[in-house]
């Protein structure tokens, strides 16, 4: 599939999702220069990455799972990126904690692009109001994230996300995983999980 990537004129960042893997399995990637890693759970990430980030400040750790408000203060200590901002309550908590600790993560607004009740994320029709609310809270919103429905073709959802990112002038787009990354790249994904 690397040959497929050569057909595309951009180089999206690949987030190696390292959840459940111990550092001795991850170190070979770090030794070869990979710097973007994703975790789903705050506690696991804090235990795994806190010390190594002190030694290797170039590492960028991404929260790719849901974030509960009671975990925000811990999350800000280790995560450089949060891909799952999906509520005003969470936005307020991140704003409060980043002001206290003088840490400002880069944040993706999670869009429930398939309008699925079992998934997090804000509805498409809420994006403008929610984005403006986040800006008032001094959050560093850099783009959007989505997980398209598994049972459907991802292209139509990625196309919609690409439209939204252009409309709001977002520079970054977090979408695409191992099963649909080529389609995501075609619709301007800048981060792949």
Stretch-by-stretch model annotation:
Residues 190-192:
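Divalent-metal-activated hydrolytic enzyme cores
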């Amino acid at each position: 599939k690397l040959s497929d990537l050569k057909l595309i004129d951009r180089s999206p960042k690949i987030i190696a999702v390292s959840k459940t893997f111990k550092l001795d399995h991850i170190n070979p990637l770090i030794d070869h220069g990979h710097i973007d890693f994703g975790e789903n759970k705050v506690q696991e990430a804090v235990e795994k990455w806190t010390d190594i980030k002190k030694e290797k400040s170039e590492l960028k750790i991404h929260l790719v799972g849901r974030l509960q408000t009671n975990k925000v203060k811990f999350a800000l200590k280790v995560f450089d990126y949060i891909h799952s901002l999906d509520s005003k309550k969470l936005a307020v908590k991140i704003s409060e904690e980043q002001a206290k600790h003088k840490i400002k993560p880069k944040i993706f607004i999670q869009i429930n692009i398939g309008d699925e009740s079992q998934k997090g994320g804000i509805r498409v029709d809420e994006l403008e109001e929610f984005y403006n609310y986040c800006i008032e809270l001094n959050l560093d919103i850099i783009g959007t994230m989505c997980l398209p429905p598994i049972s459907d073709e991802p292209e139509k959802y990625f196309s919609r996300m690409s439209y939204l990112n252009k409309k709001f002038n977002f520079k970054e787009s977090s979408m695409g995983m191992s099963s649909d990354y080529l389609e995501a790249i075609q619709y301007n994904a800048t981060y792949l999980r």
